[in-house]
Amino acid sequence: MRWITRPGWPGNLLALAAGASTLLALAPFDIWPLAVLSIAVLYLGLRELSPRQAMWRGWWFGFGLYGAGTWWIYVSMNTYGGASPLLAIVLLLAFFAALAWFFALPTWLWARWLRRNEAPLADALCFAALWLLQEAFRGWFLTGFPWLYAGYSQLDGPLAGLAPLGGVWLISFTLALTAALLCNLHRLRPRPSFLAVASVLLLAPWGLGLALKGHAWTIPAGDPLKVAAIQGNVEQDLKWDPAHIDAQLALYRDLSFSSRPVDLLVWPETAVPVLKDQAQGYIDVMGRFAAERHSALITGVPVREEVHHQRRYYNGITVTGEGDGTYLKQKLVPFGEYVPLQDVLRGAIEFFNLPMSDFARGPEDQPLLQAKGYQIAPYICYEVVYPEFAAGLAARSDLLLTISNDTWFGKSIGPLQHLQMAQMRALEAGRWMIRATNNGVTALIDPFGRITTQIPQFQQAVLYGEVVPMQQLTPYLQWRSWPLAIVCALLLGWALLAGRIAKTV
């Protein structure tokens, strides 16, 4: 097994397989021990490599992770973006290759400055800190792509109880630390005191996670609210077709008119497929209907505004009836809602001319939505995958709401991964979440991240259920990731300093 730690294709191919196997730890497969195993394979594989060799080992791991975990983007490129199969594959491979550098650069840094083979305990701690750094970085750089975090594997696992303490990143840190410590236990046997410390660091987080699993950090702020979430199941190639807009508006109107009386009536992202000012008459009619039933209607709708004498378009949510507020999406999907370098790319390839791919970013510090006297934190599609961003809104809310249109990704695992991340946000915040989508999965999620009721994908239906507004803050909403970030910064700073001192002695 020495070839695992040595340079060459056998080790690189194993890293590729390890990265790909992470997919099986996440939804919909949920074989969570594979998250620890895949990280352990990468950690072991870096032990004897030069910085350049470690960089490529990390690159292959990242390529495997994204290649297996985000292949479903092909559906939006080919089926809805107009790219030929060959072009879609080429674009997708380039996408995987670029994202793989999120692992290549940290592994180069690890081998160049941070690796401490002579100090196995410190080495494991620093590796976990670096793992957290790379997850945070890939959720931030160039607006971020915070997908496939290792911590999501624990939504139903023993570490789920850590989510309200430090979010998904605390779980990812724990998984990386566990993997590295397991690899190093045999090297600590000659030093009983260090072995004892390592054993505590290995077992304590898992014990704490199990002990806190199911612990209620928040309490009800009022009586349960009755909810109806409509899943229209509109085909993506018809959604923005002017000839089918009236039929879509009629669909949501008729399903709402025939629904049971509820407190909150929720439609998915861009359920109203025309600009809000153009559809205001329709929205007013639906608002009067909702008010007559003592309901609040919440729907996705594109919004047009004049900003500094410039016309801008936003992906939005608006509330009418017994509620108020409009929210404009802040976290946009690259190439889906805006095109980087659009002067160069637009027109060059049909894929970059997708409908509604010229949205502007909504302003920060927007007020939350209000409905039935409660504050609702809104997340439009992609926004729910950003842990810190989501926590900022959740801390001011009584209830969470996410609306989405995952039709872009067809019958793939992408929407199920998206659902898992929404469940983690509910668990981190200790709040109920309403999830309304065009074609699934529409669901209600409790404060422990559990789905209480849902509609199967690709069905036109109305989901009924109850949610409870919650108050008080989980530790994660109070402190976010700052305590963990400080610990990791100290660990990495110590490793850098220790390495420099060692080289001068």
Curated annotation (Swiss-Prot):
Pfam families according to UniProt: CN_hydrolase (PF00795), LNT_N (PF20154)
Active site location: E269 (proton acceptor), K329, C381 (nucleophile)
Regions that span the bilayer: 23-43, 58-78, 85-105, 125-145, 162-182, 192-212, 482-502
Name the record gives this protein: Apolipoprotein N-acyltransferase
Entry GO CC: plasma membrane
Species this chain originates from: Pseudomonas putida (strain ATCC 47054 / DSM 6125 / CFBP 8728 / NCIMB 11950 / KT2440)
Main enzyme class: transferase
tRNA processing in keyword set: no
Membrane topology according to the record: Multi-pass membrane protein
InterPro entries from the UniProt entry: Apolipo_AcylTrfase, C-N_Hydrolase, C-N_Hydrolase_sf, LNT_N
Gene: lnt
Compartments, as annotated in UniProt: Cell inner membrane
EC number: 2.3.1.269
